[in-house]
Amino acid sequence: MALRNVPFRSEVLGWDPDSLADYFKKLNYKDCEKAVKKYHIDGARFLNLTENDIQKFPKLRVPILSKLSQEINKNEERRSIFTRKPQVPRFPEETESHEEDNGGWSSFEEDDYESPNDDQDGEDDGDYESPNEEEEAPVEDDADYEPPPSNDEEALQNSILPAKPFPNSNSMYIDRPPSGKTPQQPPVPPQRPMAALPPPPAGRNHSPLPPPQTNHEEPSRSRNHKTAKLPAPSIDRSTKPPLDRSLAPFDREPFTLGKKPPFSDKPSIPAGRSLGEHLPKIQKPPLPPTTERHERSSPLPGKKPPVPKHGWGPDRRENDEDDVHQRPLPQPALLPMSSNTFPSRSTKPSPMNPLPSSHMPGAFSESNSSFPQSASLPPYFSQGPSNRPPIRAEGRNFPLPLPNKPRPPSPAEEENSLNEEWYVSYITRPEAEAALRKINQDGTFLVRDSSKKTTTNPYVLMVLYKDKVYNIQIRYQKESQVYLLGTGLRGKEDFLSVSDIIDYFRKMPLLLIDGKNRGSRYQCTLTHAAGYP
């Protein structure tokens, strides 16, 4: 749609539903006109359409309406450019042209891109001519910084006077005209590392040169770069070479001193190990007392618990696997218990054996089996299998639901378990209906044999409700050995027996579907049994 046919956004925001409906009427959008009047959509709501508002309009008009709202919003954005023009009126001709633009649609398009350019040219001529001329004047003179162009004479004086020393001094900083000494200071810092070399030797050997002594911290950094900076100062270098040679050994000495402590530490480590190795040799001859004393002293140092392990190794070198299992056990604070098991080989500490055996039954089964004194372990293991059978019995209780599934093994066995109160084996359909109508109450039911009498369709449930008899098939699935009620398309309940079906629908309502009238949906519970008394 052309912009000349689109109203301004500011106008549309002030529309009420009636004016918006009139606009759609002009566009020949009658269906949109009805929607606007029906849902009371005003102009502001139309410009900010939400998903709910869009759904209220016809689907065919939705893309057109969304595009229309976007164009109206864009129209206002373009209009906003021209509203700012009268704020800075330069010429009376431009103001008149803007008033004409506000009046007609065609002039809006014609002046879309012409008038702003004209205004910019005018503004450039009026606003930016004088500062440019003022800037060019000092640039032609000396091309240096000047204060703001408040007075031309003062600006020329301030710019000419500091401008002369700058090119002569070759300074990097142009923004500091008032002080002529400041440009000389910035080149000094690059010279400081060059001048920093003489002050430390001068401070050590010669007392003159107090000003450069402020940089005593920098010589440490510049020592690494002395070779590259030697040729620059020729006067002070005569004193430096001997100082550098003397400084080199001082620098080497701390490195040698730093290397000496690790050498002194290393012999201390094997010394500690040698002590640990000699300890088990002293403790080996008396087995029971030394091991107990060693364990009491072992918690004090952190490296001694592995030492008794090396003492145990020669005693049990034949069985490496036992050592692997026994070594991790004494580590977690069970050392006194594990130490008592080894002296069990001797006949003296017999009363101490039952304690470790009760706490650690499976750790030293070999040692316990070889000695009769550990008689407390066999009863423990004998009690284990006695306790295990009930655990197995509990495991056998888990598959107990399995025998529940074969409860309906076959329809033949199911017939014997059916209740004669509601089951009649040999009866025709008319006879069954007659039996139901004798009671003639809603919810009267009975189960009879199916006319087909197959394994998949063994029985039929007949229900009387509102003077109508409903016949519902009872199906049997061999694979899952369950009974299903109905065709299986709607019902998902499966039952283990026919009696379960009857008991369930005596409590829960049964859905009754008429084959002739599918729309009728009745529900009733099974209340009155119509079997033989």
From Swiss-Prot:
Adapter protein primarily involved in signaling pathways within T-cells, as well as other immune cells such as platelets, mast cells, and natural killer (NK) cells. Plays a crucial role for transducing signal from the T-cell receptor (TCR) after antigen recognition leading to T-cell activation. Mechanistically, once phosphorylated by the kinase ZAP70, mediates interactions with the guanine-nucleotide exchange factor VAV1, the adapter protein NCK and the kinase ITK. Interacts with SLA. Interacts with CBLB. Interacts with GRB2. Interacts with SHB. Interacts with PRAM1. Interacts (via SH2 domain) with CD6 (via tyrosine phosphorylated C-terminus). Interacts with FYB1 and the phosphorylated form of FYB2. Interacts with 14-3-3 adapter/YWHAZ; this phosphorylation leads to YWHAZ proteolytic degradation. Interacts with VAV1; this interaction plays a role in TCR-mediated cytokine production. Interacts with AGER; this interaction plays an important role in AGER-mediated pro-inflammatory responses and cytokine release. GO terms for cellular component: cell-cell junction; cytosol; plasma membrane raft; TCR signalosome. The modification Phosphotyrosine is found at residue 23. SMART domains: SAM, SH2. It holds the Pfam family SAM_2. Highly expressed in spleen, thymus and peripheral blood leukocytes. Highly expressed also in T-cell and monocytic cell lines, expressed at lower level in B-cell lines. Not detected in fibroblast or neuroblastoma cell lines. It is linked to Immunodeficiency 81: An autosomal recessive disorder characterized by recurrent infections, including fungal infections, associated with T cell, neutrophil, and NK cell dysfunction. B cells may also show maturation abnormalities. Other features include autoimmune hemolytic anemia and abnormal platelet aggregation. Residues 337-350, 365-376 have a biased composition (Polar residues). Keywords: Cytoplasm, Phosphoprotein, SH2 domain. The modification Phosphoserine is found at residues 207, 376, 410. The SH2 domain mediates interaction with phosphorylated CD6. The SH2 domain mediates interaction with SHB. Possesses an N-terminal acidic domain containing three tyrosine phosphorylation motifs, a central proline-rich region, and a C-terminal SH2 domain. This is Lymphocyte cytosolic protein 2. Coiled coil: none annotated. Residues 422-530 form the SH2 domain. Its main location: cytoplasm. It is found in: Cytoplasm. Phosphorylated after T-cell receptor activation by ZAP70, ITK and TXK, which leads to the up-regulation of Th1 preferred cytokine IL-2. SYK-dependent phosphorylation is required for recruitment of PI3K signaling components. Residues 108-155 have a biased composition (Acidic residues). Residues 15-81 form the SAM domain. Transmembrane segments: none annotated. InterPro entries: Immunoreceptor_sig_adapters, SAM, SAM/pointed_sf, SH2, SH2_dom_sf. Residues 184-213, 400-411 have a biased composition (Pro residues). Residues 78-417 are annotated as: Disordered. It comes from the Eukaryota.
